[in-house]
């Protein structure tokens, strides 16, 4: 599904070069639940931005569904981002004073294809917010806002969900509710790529990629995956 070969990333600002990623080699298969883990400044968010087609490598090759990303035109890249990828971020990125329903509908508003309005209600129900569909975003708790963000990422039925520190602004119990939603989506076939600095959050994944100083230091599949407590699951 995804393959990176000898990927490097650096930024140049006022002739100052900052090297962020070094010699990244990575394969991600369809249906995996992966946690990318590391301290602040380790390069994990930059790696996610490259994987999610929000940024490009300085050097190296990136293949998405066997297509070389570096040779894609801007229109094709945009289509991949809109149809095959869903994003969830730490700060929710919701429109203020706008209803849950309208926030979730937003990606469909920009779609060039024929849309099915029922997909909005389906996505809202999938994250347990059917009873909040008409609430404004500023009337919601932090956990509810993150659920809206997940519903919005689902509305185009993407193959992959990228979640960058989705529990970072939440208390531990609410964070585990978000983890339970991501786990449920993975159980239903979605590929989940989660960026986190929290070990307990990473342990709900099936594979943990550890990073430090821009390098992958460990890629672990042989561990006991933490189970979601039924008391934290959405009803």
Q: Where are each of the predicted segments found?
A:
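ABC family nucleotide-binding domain
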Residues: 2-24, 28-205
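A short hydrophobic/aromatic micro-motif that marks alpha-helical segments and, especially, helix-coil
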Residues: 28, 212-213
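Serine/proline-rich low-complexity intrinsically disordered segments, especially terminal tails, linkers
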Residues: 42-44, 212, 235
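Residues at the C-termini of beta-strands that transition into short coil/loop
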Residues: 73, 212, 220
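Conserved short hydrophobic beta-strand within the ABC ATPase nucleotide-binding domain
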Residues: 208-210
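Conserved beta-strand-loop-alpha-helix hinge in the C-terminal portion
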Residues: 215-235
